[in-house]
Amino acid sequence: MTSQEPEVLFPASAPQVTTDLSNNVVLTTVNDLYNWAKMSSLWPLLYGTACCFIEFAAMLGSRFDFDRFGLLPRSSPRTADLIITAGTVTMKMAPALVKLYQQMAEPKYVIAMGACTISGGMFSSDSYTAVRGVDKLIPVDVYIPGCPPRPEAIMDAIVKLRKKIAAEDMRERGRLQQTHRYYTVKHNLKPVPEIITGKYLESETRQAPPPELAAAIGLPVPPALQTADFKQAEQQLKALRGGM
């Protein structure tokens, strides 16, 4: 029989295999990895409409180092997942803000910065154009009170948003999608049709000169100017000139 060395049941030193694994292998879950990637690479869409944005612009400088949180400002809502509303939101800008929010990809987050954005601020009592809180238009994740808030407050809001993202669960993504959450409070906002349609250059009067000018310089009158409306307007103009 060969002699066997006695086996030590509880060694004083750590096993070599376990040490190598702990130095080279990280154990995590897909959910934690997904949340870590989201909160470490937030791409904000800068939406500044008033004086609060000046404080936010100060945070972009080297003194406060906005990039330390992995935030990369974007100019297009389709590549952004965070929108920071800084300043007063008016009735005229509200449809544009909702459209920008709808164009952002899921998952998306909103930070309301300043008293005017949160509740209307000093315009909440007698203004007929200010929206009394941006949460009546889009869902808000973090509020930053102040008039205006300091850059340190913005940094604190970013930290709180990162903690909120870290606590999310991938299995609840379908339930947490920010849909059907508009107008949580009754509001008198009435969407209006777009003013700038790009078709103002296609009007008949811009496609060809007026009939009088065309006749004076010897140009043929286009068919568009020979309609009943133009003929009637021309007759009325002649009648007015005859009565003068």
Swiss-Prot record:
Membrane topology qualifier: Peripheral membrane protein
GO MF, one annotated term: quinone binding
Main localization (coarse): membrane
Subcellular location: Cellular thylakoid membrane
Domain of life: Bacteria
A GO CC term assigned to this protein in UniProt: respiratory chain complex I
Listed InterPro entries: NADH_UbQ_OxRdtase-like_20kDa, NADH_UQ_OxRdtase_20Kd_su
Comment on bound cofactor: Binds 1 [4Fe-4S] cluster.
NCBIfam families cross-referenced by the UniProt entry: nuoB_fam (TIGR01957), PRK06411.1 (NF005012)
Stated role: NDH-1 shuttles electrons from an unknown electron donor, via FMN and iron-sulfur (Fe-S) centers, to quinones in the respiratory and/or the photosynthetic chain. The immediate electron acceptor for the enzyme in this species is believed to be plastoquinone. Couples the redox reaction to proton translocation, and thus conserves the redox energy in a proton gradient. Cyanobacterial NDH-1 also plays a role in inorganic carbon-concentration.
Family per similarity comment: Belongs to the complex I 20 kDa subunit family.
Name the UniProt record assigns to this protein: NAD(P)H-quinone oxidoreductase subunit K
Organism: Synechococcus sp. (strain JA-3-3Ab) (Cyanobacteria bacterium Yellowstone A-Prime)
Taxonomic lineage from the root: Bacteria, Bacillati, Cyanobacteriota, Cyanophyceae, Synechococcales
Gene: ndhK
